Every structure is written in C-alpha cells, then in structure tokens.
C-alpha cells in the first residue's frame, strides 16, 4: 500500500507544477496530472479523475492536490471520492510548489504514514511557504482566532410573515452547465453581492451526492441551497424571503424558462456555460446549443428577458442572438 498523488487544475497549471516538482525533487512514481481545459465539461473531468485513479494500485490511498476550493477539479474529485467510500481519499486545495514538495517528502520519509497524517503536514507546509519580502509585508498572526457570532432565528418563520419589502431579490440569474464552480464562487458571487446561492434544478435536487458537493462548494459567508424549479417559484412569491439577495443557477435554459413562466421575475439572464454534447453546435468556446435551446432563448426573449453572455464578470458582454446567427444552428 502506498499513496498515489493526483495534481489537478484548471488549464495546464498542474502540468507546469508537476514539471517544477520534478526539477527539484526528481521524477516520482505514482503521480498523475489531471487538467481541465476550456473546451471540456464536468463529465470529461470526471473521466480524467477515474482514469488517473486506475493507474494506481487497488490498495493505494489517493491524495488530490487541487488548485481551487469549489473549482471544477475540486468538485469532480469530491464526486469521485463520494462514489468510492471504501477508497481512502483526501483533497487539498490551494495548490502550490511547497505543497507538492512536501507531499513528495512525506511519502519518502514515512512510507507507512496514513493519508490523514500526510495531509495535515502538507497543509502546514504549504501555508508556511507563502512569505513576503520585505518581511514587514507579512501579516502579524493573531494570538487568538476571531470568532464570528451569527444570530439566527430559531425555528421556522410563520407563513405570511413579511420580511423587508417581501420580495426575493435576484441579484444574478445564470445558466451554467457546471452550476456552482470556481468562477461562480470566486467571481460572480462577490460581483453580484448575493448572500445566498440557489441552484434550481429538478435533476440535481434528487441527487443527494451532488447536493452535498454544491453546499460544500459555497464561498465563505454565503449559503447554498439546491431546490426543484417549483420550490424556486414558491420562494419567489414568499414574503419571508424579502431580505434575501440571491444568485440563481440554472443548469439549462429550459429550467430558466420554466421558472420565468412560473412567475419568477428575471429581467436579465447571464448565459455563462453550456456544455457540448451530441447534436449540439458550438456557438463560442463555452456555449453549445441545439435548435431546442435556441427556441427556448427566443421564448425567454418574448417574455422580455434580456441576455448577458459572459463567462466571468470581466469579460465584455456579447449579443446572444448574433452568436446564434453566426453559428448557423440546424
């Protein structure tokens, strides 16, 4: 029994840091690299992880060093771990070179060490490896941790109670095949100033594992919920959500249309990512559609919904129907 290491990242960062680790520590056995490229979807990444694990011995424990908490590599590694409860796996995010070197060191120094001990040592070393020069730029460590006290209402709020103005605030509504992942957690959530993420999907609401992964992928200070479309429609009309500022995530434009037709007030829909599949045409490098998708967007347009085609907030807005026309979807 040993420890197999998977280095995982958005783009080719994992390949580069693997090469850097080899320059410093020499070539290592039982190391696999998983990269998530712009033209790939979650299922591609899921397959990459499963292929990587198959390269290790059946009794090897698995250590995943991923780039970003709540990013797609983390999410798919969590999915694989959840589907293999008998296989010891640990996932550490914040990938840097000190982390990788320490992982190699831990394996070399104590071949019998369990993955729990190895992970604890790696986390400490990867944090200690972040330093600044001049030294006075380094933050002073607090002697006692600052604890936030959150006052929450105990028990259910009675139906009919009006909070604030009684209207759910939809700060951002987005179509994204990947739902809650790194770009949404680290870019769109703060940009939208949302205090709650609502994933509205009948499919995901019935999948306990995916619900768990989405909840743990939420950024600090923001709650994530997974609900069927009907529950989103109910919540949009419930005065108890008057102080909620929500980021709504739809897996498909069809789900967004159902919500709007059910009375959810969405004035603008951010179209961020639609994964490619058989029968669909690439509209740009992250959007893939078929005639049904186009018809759905046309219905949304007829319901006075406008569209913001951007993968991340810093992108310039694109015109959805100009992209569709150029793609010549048949």
UniProtKB/Swiss-Prot annotation:
Residues 2-130 form the PTS EIIA type-4 domain. Keywords: Cell membrane, Cytoplasm, Kinase, Membrane, Phosphoprotein, Phosphotransferase system, Sugar transport, Transferase, Transport. The record marks 91 as: Involved in the phosphoryl transfer between H-10 and H-175. It is found in: Cytoplasm; Cell membrane. Residues 166-330 form the PTS EIIB type-4 domain. GO terms for biological process: phosphoenolpyruvate-dependent sugar phosphotransferase system. Residues 143-161 are annotated as: Hinge. One of its GO terms (cellular component) is cytoplasm. It catalyses: D-mannose(out) + N(pros)-phospho-L-histidyl-[protein] = D-mannose 6-phosphate(in) + L-histidyl-[protein]. GO terms for molecular function: kinase activity; protein-N(PI)-phosphohistidine-sugar phosphotransferase activity. SUPFAM superfamilies: PTS IIb component, PTS system fructose IIA component-like. Its EC number is 2.7.1.191. Its main location: cytoplasm. The PTS EIIA type-4 domain is phosphorylated by phospho-HPr on a histidyl residue. Then, it transfers the phosphoryl group to the PTS EIIB type-4 domain. The PTS EIIB type-4 domain is phosphorylated by phospho-EIIA on a histidyl residue. Then, it transfers the phosphoryl group to the sugar substrate concomitantly with the sugar uptake processed by the PTS EIIC type-4 domain. The phosphoenolpyruvate-dependent sugar phosphotransferase system (sugar PTS), a major carbohydrate active transport system, catalyzes the phosphorylation of incoming sugar substrates concomitantly with their translocation across the cell membrane. The enzyme II ManXYZ PTS system is involved in mannose transport. PANTHER family: PTS PERMEASE-RELATED-RELATED, PTS SYSTEM MANNOSE-SPECIFIC EIIAB COMPONENT-RELATED. Homodimer. This is PTS system mannose-specific EIIAB component. The lineage of its organism: Bacteria, Bacillati, Bacillota, Bacilli, Lactobacillales. The gene is manX.
């Amino acid at each position: 029994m040993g420890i197999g290491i998977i280095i995982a990242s958005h783009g080719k960062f994992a390949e580069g840091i693997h090469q850097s680790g080899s320059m410093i520590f020499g070539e290592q056995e039982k190391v696999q690299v998983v990269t998530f490229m712009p033209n790939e979807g979650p299922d591609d990444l899921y397959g990459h992880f499963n292929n990587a694990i198959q390269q290790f011995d059946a009794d090897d424990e698995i250590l995943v060093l991923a780039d970003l908490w709540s990013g797609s590599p983390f999410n798919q590694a969590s999915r694989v771990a959840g589907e293999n409860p008998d296989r010891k796996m640990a996932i550490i995010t914040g990938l840097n070179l000190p982390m990788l070197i320490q992982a190699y060191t831990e394996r070399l120094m104590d071949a019998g060490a369990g993955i729990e001990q190895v992970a604890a040592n790696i986390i400490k070393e990867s944090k200690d490896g972040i330093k600044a020069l001049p030294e006075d730029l380094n933050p002073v460590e607090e002697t006692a941790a600052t604890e936030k006290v959150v006052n929450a209402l105990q028990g259910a709020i009675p139906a009919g109670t009006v909070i604030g103005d009684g209207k759910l605030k939809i700060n951002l509504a987005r179509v994204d095949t990947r739902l809650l992942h790194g770009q949404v957690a680290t870019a769109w959530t703060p940009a939208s100033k949302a205090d709650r993420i609502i994933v509205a999907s009948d499919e995901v609401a019935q999948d306990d594992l995916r619900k768990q992964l989405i909840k743990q992928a939420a950024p600090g200070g923001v709650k994530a919920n997974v609900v069927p479309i009907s529950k989103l429609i109910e919540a949009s009309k419930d005065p108890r959500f008057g102080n909620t500022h929500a980021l709504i995530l739809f897996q498909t434009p069809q789900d967004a249309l159902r919500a709007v037709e059910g009375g959810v007030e969405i004035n603008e829909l951010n179209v961020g990512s639609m994964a490619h599949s058989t029968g669909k045409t690439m509209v740009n490098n992250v959007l893939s559609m078929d005639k049904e998708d186009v018809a759905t967007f046309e219905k949304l347009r007829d319901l006075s919904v406008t569209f913001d085609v951007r993968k991340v907030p810093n992108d310039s807005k694109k015109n959805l129907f100009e992209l569709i026309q150029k793609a010549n979807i048949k």
